[in-house]
Structures are given as structure tokens and as C-alpha cells.
A protein has these predicted regions:
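Class I SAM-dependent transferase core
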Residues: 1-77, 113-130
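Conserved SAM-binding loop of SAM-dependent methyltransferases across substrates and taxa
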Residues: 89-102
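Acidic active-site catalytic centers that drive phospho-/nucleotidyl reactions
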Residues: 62, 84, 109
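S-adenosylmethionine
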Residues: 103-106, 110-171
Length: 171
């Protein structure tokens, strides 16, 4: 699919109106992502908004707020590993990773077409440490995690800032 056109200049204007200054190197990939999202949305209904501007102000701006919070308020003693369960349209993940690239970020999506969308975006706009994992966020995911590090259960011990989710059963 050919992406809809989103102007980086419009994107910079929208960001300024929302209280953000986007780096030059972020504008083109973020505009490209929004264009792809709008194009795929016509066929797959990824988001409820119908224009790139509405999508920016109702959805993408949340990613920018989250990125600001993570940069300014959360201090981790080790590189974080984030799991975005039910990533769908790549929100908040893809815009977030365009402005905050600490550690690893896994977008977990069960639906094949949505996982394909996420993979397509990452193929066109590579984001370091950002991955798509197509699996249901249930038993299969937890079994896969058991073979790796206990990322989720140790998150509270790694961060010196606020803890958002600690899945460990033992205190």
C-alpha cells in the first residue's frame, strides 16, 4: 500500500500547538508512519480517527507525553524492556520509540494483519531495539518469557522511579 501524504511541516506545526518540539530527524519518519496508518486504516480500521491531524491530536500526542515522562521522570538502573500488549496500530509504541529509544520495546499483537502493519512500519522506519511479537497475550506469551529473563517481575527492582506494573507473586 502506498502511504497517504502527511507533511513534516504540518506535523511540526501540530506538535508545537500541542506543546512539543520535534527533532528534525523525527519529523519525516513520524509523518511517514502517520501516512501509513491513515492508508492502512481505510482497509483495516486500525484507529477510530479519520484524518492524520485528528489522529495526531487524539492518539499520537499521548505517545509524546509518555516519551517526555520517560525521559524526564523515570530513571532506570538498567536498560528497560517494555512490553506493549495489543499493539494494534502501533500506539503508543511507534511514535514513542521515535523519540525515546532506551532499551528494548516489544509490540505484542495477536492479529496477523495488525502484526503485518507493525512489521511494515518497522521495515520502512527502523527503530533500534523495537520488535514485533505476534502471539496472544496469554499462556503462550508467558511461556515464552519463562525461557528468557524475568523481565516483568524484576521491573520494580530495576527502576528507581515509579513502578507501573510488577507481575511477581512474591513481595
Amino acid at each position: 500500500m502506498r502511504p497517504s501524504s502527511v507533511s513534516p511541516y504540518d506535523l511540526q506545526d501540530w506538535a508545537k500547538r500541542a506543546g512539543f518540539e520535534l527533532a528534525e530527524e523525527t519529523l519525516h519518519p513520524l509523518a511517514g508512519y502517520l501516512g501509513l496508518l491513515m492508508q492502512w486504516n481505510k482497509v483495516m480500521n486500525l484507529v477510530g480517527t479519520r484524518t492524520a491531524e485528528d489522529t495526531f491530536f487524539t492518539l499520537v500526542v499521548d505517545s509524546l507525553h509518555l516519551g517526555r515522562f520517560l525521559r524526564e521522570d523515570v530513571k532506570c538502573s538498567a536498560a528497560p524492556c517494555c512490553w506493549d500488549l495489543g499493539s494494534g496500530a502501533g500506539l503508543p509504541g511507534i511514535p514513542l520509540r521515535m523519540i525515546w529509544q532506551e532499551g528494548d520495546y516489544w509490540m505484542v499483537e495477536a492479529r496477523e494483519k495488525r502484526a503485518l502493519f507493525l512489521s511494515t512500519v518497522l521495515a520502512q522506519y527502523p527503530l533500534p531495539g523495537t520488535h514485533v511479537f505476534r502471539v496472544r497475550a496469554g499462556a503462550s506469551l508467558w511461556q515464552g518469557l519463562q525461557h528468557g529473563q524475568r523481565i516483568l517481575s524484576s521491573a520494580g527492582r530495576l527502576c528507581r522511579g515509579p513502578v507501573f506494573w510488577n507481575s511477581s507473586k512474591a513481595a
